[in-house]
Regions:
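Conserved alpha/beta-domain cores
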Residues: 1-133, 139-141, 147-149
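Short Ser/Thr-rich beta->loop micro-motif in glycosyltransferases that lines
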Residues: 138, 158
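Active-site-proximal glycine-rich helix-loop-beta segment
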Residues: 150-152, 157
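Expand to "…catalyze enediolate/carbanion chemistry for C-C bond making/breaking, isomerization
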Residues: 160-165
């Protein structure tokens, strides 16, 4: 899911009936929605600041739950995209570990209309250098290239469900 409110509406009752369901938050997460995100999601793929990381850690502590975290890297250094600059990733990794987050990997969305291969390769190298186990990259249009660079999570919803209206 990429919207907290939609996930809460769609999945709260379903998750109560089936505790094995694992939900992934893949969209931008605002700090005012963290409480609900931590309650419903098992994975958050879009952490991009100390402020957001701290808020997640605080909410997890309140309800005694651990959410698996990916840091979102703005790998193409695009001003219009969310994500931390690749040069600042190591500091945020250390901070997340220091405050007790279950940081498992990095996530990126490369620039559109550009061959993503170099970006995926760079993300794979960065992920390995930080000794993280998971890599969230690749969408319906480029997931095969992402898999070549060891992506462990791909976002292919539009291939399955069609484009959002």
């Amino acid at each position: 899911e990429n919207k907290v409110q939609e996930a809460v509406e769609k999945w709260t009752e379903i998750k109560k009936k089936n505790s094995k369901i694992r939900l992934h938050m893949i969209g931008k997460l605002q700090t005012n929605k963290v409480k609900f995100a931590v309650q419903i999601f098992n994975y958050i793929h879009s952490v991009d600041s100390k402020k957001l990381a701290k808020k997640i850690a605080d909410e997890q502590h309140k309800i005694n739950k651990k959410v698996k975290i990916f840091l979102q890297v703005n790998i193409g250094d695009e001003y219009q995209k969310s994500g931390i600059n690749k040069n600042d990733v190591q500091k945020l990794v250390f901070y997340c570990k220091e405050i007790g987050l279950d940081l498992i990997g990095l996530m990126c969305i490369p620039p559109i209309n550009v061959d993503p291969e170099n970006y995926f390769g760079e993300m794979n190298e960065l992920n390995k250098s930080l000794d993280l186990s998971e890599l969230s990259m690749g969408m319906s249009s480029d997931f095969l290239i992402a898999a070549k660079y060891f992506s462990t999570y791909v976002r292919i919803g539009s291939s399955i469900f069609g484009k959002r209206s």
